[in-house]
């Protein structure tokens, strides 16, 4: 297991408190949301993977926000399409 130092990640995010929030959010995405890691897993836990992604500049709070908005938009579009199909079928 690779040892992770958080200093590089703190420098990418700004402060250690925001780092905790961003890393936890990303780790949760991988664990619960089924998102794939952006770095090799190397048998690491999702929290370590999240920190490595942040260290490499692949994940920031802004990137997570944009991805969440895109996914929400796609989900809303799919729901609208389904409702439209149901409504057209009733005519």
From Swiss-Prot:
Molecular function via GO: DNA binding; DNA-directed RNA polymerase activity
Query: What superkingdom does the record give?
Result: Bacteria
Gene Ontology biological-process annotations: DNA-templated transcription
UniProt keyword annotation of Oxidoreductase present = no
The EC number(s) given in the record are: 2.7.7.6
| One Pfam family this sequence matches | RNA_pol_Rpb6
What keywords are annotated for this sequence in UniProt? Answer: DNA-directed RNA polymerase, Nucleotidyltransferase, Transcription, Transferase
> Can you quote a single GO CC term?
DNA-directed RNA polymerase complex
Quote the catalytic activity from the record.
RNA(n) + a ribonucleoside 5'-triphosphate = RNA(n+1) + diphosphate
**Family (UniProt):** Belongs to the RNA polymerase subunit omega family.
What job does this protein perform? Promotes RNA polymerase assembly. Latches the N- and C-terminal regions of the beta' subunit thereby facilitating its interaction with the beta and alpha subunits.
Quaternary structure and partners: The RNAP catalytic core consists of 2 alpha, 1 beta, 1 beta' and 1 omega subunit. When a sigma factor is associated with the core the holoenzyme is formed, which can initiate transcription.
Which protein, by its recorded name, is this? DNA-directed RNA polymerase subunit omega
* Source organism of the structure: Erwinia tasmaniensis (strain DSM 17950 / CFBP 7177 / CIP 109463 / NCPPB 4357 / Et1/99)
């Amino acid at each position: 297991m690779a040892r992770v130092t958080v200093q590089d990640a703190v420098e990418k995010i700004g402060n250690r408190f925001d780092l905790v929030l961003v890393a936890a959010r990303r780790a949760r995405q991988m664990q619960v949301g089924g998102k794939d890691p952006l770095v090799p897993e190397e048998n690491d836990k999702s929290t370590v993977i999240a920190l490595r992604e942040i260290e490499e500049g692949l994940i920031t709070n802004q990137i997570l926000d944009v991805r969440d908005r895109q996914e929400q938009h796609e989900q809303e579009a799919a729901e609208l399409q389904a409702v439209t199909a149901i409504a057209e079928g009733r005519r």
